[in-house]
UniProtKB/Swiss-Prot annotation:
Species of the source: Escherichia coli O6:H1 (strain CFT073 / ATCC 700928 / UPEC)
SMART domains for the chain: S4 (SM00363)
GO molecular function, one term: 23S rRNA pseudouridine(2605) synthase activity
Annotated catalysed reactions: uridine(2605) in 23S rRNA = pseudouridine(2605) in 23S rRNA
Secretion signal, residue range per the UniProt entry: none
The protein's role, per its UniProt record: Responsible for synthesis of pseudouridine from uracil-2605 in 23S ribosomal RNA.
Protein name: Ribosomal large subunit pseudouridine synthase B
Active site (record annotation): D110 (nucleophile)
Enzyme type, top EC level: isomerase
PANTHER family attached to this UniProt entry: PSEUDOURIDINE SYNTHASE FAMILY PROTEIN-RELATED (PTHR47683), RIBOSOMAL LARGE SUBUNIT PSEUDOURIDINE SYNTHASE B (PTHR47683:SF3)
Region (Disordered): 256-291
Every S4 RNA-binding domain range: 3-75
Key words, A-Z: Isomerase, RNA-binding, rRNA processing
PROSITE patterns the record matches: PSI_RSU (PS01149), S4 (PS50889)
Length: 291
């Protein structure tokens, strides 16, 4: 069965659907030697040859690919880009290496924002989670500097005009602090550039700290250090897929890795047991000889 080329490439982890559409429009993709056009359809067969910038790439049937998702604790100071010409650290630097796929960031966090950033190998999942029409909640813990009164909170809930259109917080909850340094938890259902900061600035309040603590129902994992990552299990991955109307996965790389670790641990235990038995027998034999 044929599928749209951009969907096949996105699913294979070669970028989000929007990124793939851009490189197709730029004439950087070829199918069986012919430059591809946006909207082309392909059928995955053993002889299919797809190239990006002249490099042959790997694509597989949907059922053959395992969708993987990472939760990463982005520190302040890291850029949400694959490569920085100035050599500054990026969010991709610490991620585990992949074969035949690559990590795609689900949205972005600006350089001075820290917290939860999701990555996936499935470009279609990334695209749907980011798209404003899906209205996936993002929750932030924000420390603000300035006087915050009921009128400002009301404006932030009802909506203020930004340079790229109206915006509002879905929820605002006071979470502590004294004087002009206060913490709030806020939620949005879209991911415009620096939107949280710009909303507060629109009512005359400065943001001094910003942490993303949740994406959908996936929280920033407790105990995860800054710069650390953990892979979501099958239930969490399928929650995200079902949230954006993608079919559930039936297997998970996490389960495979856990099984491997369990098998290795069992092998080590058996080896230790055998070693103990052999050593015990030698000691026993030694005592008999001395007797």
């Amino acid at each position: 069965m044929s599928e749209k080329l951009q969907k096949v490439l996105a699913r294979a982890g070669h970028g989000s659907r929007r990124e793939i559409e851009s490189i197709i429009e730029a004439g950087r993709v070829s199918v069986d030697g012919k430059i591809a056009k946006l909207g082309d359809r392909v059928e995955i067969t053993p002889g299919l040859k797809i190239r990006i910038d002249g490099h042959l790439i790997s694509v597989r049937e949907s059922a053959e690919q395992i969708c993987r998702v990472l939760a990463y604790y982005k520190p302040e100071g890291e850029l949400c880009t694959r490569n920085d010409p100035e050599g500054r650290p990026t969010v991709f630097d610490r991620l585990p290496k992949l074969r035949g796929a690559r990590w795609i960031a689900v949205g972005r966090l600006d350089v001075n924002t820290c917290g939860l950033l999701l990555f996936t190998t499935d470009g279609e999942l990334a695209n749907r989670l980011m798209h404003p029409s899906r209205e996936v909640e993002r929750e932030y813990a924000v420390r603000v500097f300035g006087q915050v009164d009921d009128a400002k909170l009301r404006d932030l809930s009802r909506g203020v005009q930004l340079e790229d259109g109206p915006a509002a917080f879905k929820t605002i909850k006071f979470s502590g602090g004294e004087g002009i340094n206060q913490w709030y938890n806020v939620t949005l259902t879209e991911g415009r550039n620096r939107e949280v900061r710009r909303l507060w600035e629109a009512v005359g309040v400065q943001v001094s700290r910003l942490i993303r603590v949740r994406y959908g129902d996936i929280p920033l994992p407790k105990g995860l250090p800054r710069g650390g990552w953990t892979e979501l299990d099958l239930a969490q991955t399928n929650y995200l897929r079902e949230l954006v109307e993608l079919p559930p996965e039936t297997s998970s790389k996490v389960a495979v890795e856990k099984d491997r670790r369990r098998m290795k641990a069992n092998q080590i235990r058996r080896a230790v047991k055998r070693h103990s038995q052999v050593s015990g027998g030698r000691r026993s034999g030694g005592r008999n000889n001395n007797g």
